[in-house]
Amino acid sequence: MAAPGTPPPSASGGGGGEPRQLPELIRLKRDGGHLREADIRNFVHAVIDGRAQDTQIGAMLMAIRLQGMNLEETSVLTRALAESGQQLEWPKAWHQQLVDKHSTGGVGDKVSLVLAPALAACGCKVPMISGRSLGHTGGTLDKLESIPGFGVTQSPEQMLHILEEVGCCIVGQSAKLVPADGILYAARDVTATVDSVPLITASILSKKAVEGLSTLVVDVKFGGAAVFPDQEKARELAKMLVRVGVSLGLKVAAALTAMDNPLGRSVGHTLEVEEALLCLDGAGPPDLRDLVIRLGGAILWISGQAETQDQGAARVAAALDDGSARRRFQLMLSAQGVDPGLAKALCSGSPTQRRQLLPHAREQEELLAPADGIVECVRALPLARVLHDLGAGRSRAGQPIRPGVGAEVLVDVGQCLSRGTPWLRVHLDGPALSSQQRRTLQGALVLSDRAPFKVPSPFAELVLPPTIAQP
């Protein structure tokens, strides 16, 4: 089922000429030069076989961050990363059905937990390779691991079986899949090179290229809690993702979505699983449901499984409302190690019953509105940073987390709020919130004196490949 990827051409092949030594490559990119294919492949080989020192990897990443890469360089880097490990192979009859979604990271972003089973209920095959929380953003794998027994490590053969029986699986990146990206990703996090368009593009698309997809939609976040606060910079990334995807023979679209407020009302691993289950019940926060339906509709339309984006969105909404998406989620839980009785209880139980089945923090503290006003914004970044400090996130790979730590936002953006009304409930294992943490959290609540308003959808725009016309 899984076969080793075709070994990349030798660094002396492609792009012309013999490969240059690493210091020369670093100097060339530092000074704004363009790297040949042979140079890029030589660098990736050196990362994998240990010839590249940590200092050289960091220097090259910083050179790329400061000087950028053109389309050709970014495409070559993406292919070289993808070819550094195994390629996943699926039955040819599945090709049109093989789809996925990726997010650049946000606060309260539990879309994958809902969207993957919803797409499976619509007839798709979703081999989703996800990540863990790092910094202030949550990780899909950590959220799922708050469910007792859920296993994110699945072999290619196990993934094939789950896709045959369920239609979706959500797994972690293994050492055999895109190992070069794993090394560069860890280095980017500690060298202040995360916010690089070519490096983000190559990292995302190399992982998705090995999945053997027909269609990918990337949720590119912008705003106060996103990698790119500015929508124009996020649009630059979206366009690069689409163009490199075309060069790889992959249909890639990018949705620009706002990440100023948390998505939904819950932040934290267990709390987000419970909110995802509400959405799978056909309920849940409107902004979460809206984003799931819009992203799912785009995927079904672009992959040719719906005639229009609206038709695709209607099918995803129906899967949420008729329970078929929730049934797929239950099957996925059982297939990935959760006791079938627990999986059934989680998916068919009430919110109160679900709360008794998942790990929760020992204490709760509520924060009160300091004044009257209209809720203009609940700033996601300071909220996420406090929860990170309380144990919901990790500062280094492998660090344990507290799945029950989190927060419930008790108000909606746009609503009228009276002084002394609870607006946030924090779940923590103790000790109590410090005065500084309380000040930071209270600073996340932005009040205004304008009239109440209805918050717009977080979905801002969709960047499509040139072969597909805007709806």
Swiss-Prot record:
Q: List the residue ranges of the region (Disordered).
A: 1-21
Pathway assignment reads: Pyrimidine metabolism; dTMP biosynthesis via salvage pathway; dTMP from thymine: step 1/2
Biased segments, Pro residues type: 1-10
Question: What disulfide bonds does the UniProt entry report for this chain?
Answer: none
Per the record, the similarity remark reads:
Belongs to the thymidine/pyrimidine-nucleoside phosphorylase family.
What is the annotated role of this protein in its UniProt record? Catalyzes the reversible phosphorolysis of thymidine. The produced molecules are then utilized as carbon and energy sources or in the rescue of pyrimidine bases for nucleotide synthesis.
| Protein name (record) | Thymidine phosphorylase
In the record, what lineage is assigned to the organism producing the protein?
Eukaryota, Metazoa, Chordata, Craniata, Vertebrata
